[in-house]
Amino acid sequence: MRRLTRVAMAMTFLVVLAGSVVRMTGSGMGCPDWPKCFGLMIPPTEASEVTWQEGSTYDRGRMLLKRDTLWVAQADLHSTDFEAERATGQWVAYDKHDYAVFNPLHTWVEFINRLLGALTGIPALLLLGWTFWRGVKVRHWKPFAWAVVHLFWLGLVAWLGKKVVDGNLIPFSITIHMLGAMAILVSLAGLLHSVWEHQGRIDLLPRGKGWLAVALVLTVAQLVLGTQVREQVDLLNHAEVLRADWIGALPGWWKVHRSGSWVVLAVQLMWLMPLRNAEGSLRTIVRMASALLSAQILTGVLFVNFGMPAWAQPVHLLLAVGLVLTNVWVLLHYRAQRT
């Protein structure tokens, strides 16, 4: 079960990475509908596949571009006269948003992101079945409870993904989508810990728990602020502001995110420093958290001083997610130590 949980966690990290690449490349609307892509199960690769062609056959739900508008076929039809068919209601303009652009790169980047998201459902269902069987067998239901929570968040994030597309990447919904993905990872950490806790506990210093809890809250807040900064960068990019001018063009509140990183660093160190001489598995956790924290600060400095390099954006996000998970994992051990 632990191996399957780790697989699910690794796949979720891949989805977070893919989602960050989608944002980095501006591919969020590469597929204008959900769950299909231009009404197709396999996305188009050429513009001719999404433009009206006389004499072509189209299935119901097929989406085409014409006159800078996205049109949806209302029935299966052999199309011969677009205007006549539009007048009779066989083609209807898509009304959930007005985004009508086809970019094959964006389409496939978004499709791969969705495909990875769908594949995460496989280990989620396997975990649900496995933990239920284990609960019946050994009367230990905590892993099953975590598996249910995990599946709930997975379904909710999938639904939010649809809402994000339908709303043409409504800004705050993207942040909520990211927090949902974070909740999926936290539920997996809880599941893994519920299996792990019967095989030994980690000795922790009681005085570090308070600082760790504060560090977790501040790091999540930084993650939310960072997502909002990223959305502002997207707006600047769409407005064709030069990359070198992005920092200067950001709203003043982004400095809260920039300066807040040093507060997060200080608070994280408050629980890490007393454990610097830890042994065993705790030593590994402390080293991992320290490495994630250092790399997170480094990529933040790169953003400010080197014009927000595109490659650093997904790395920065993954490091933040990893740091949050490390905090959650240690807090779970603190809780187990109390019970």
PLM segments and residue spans:
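Polytopic transmembrane helical bundles with strong interfacial aromatic enrichment
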Residues: 1-339
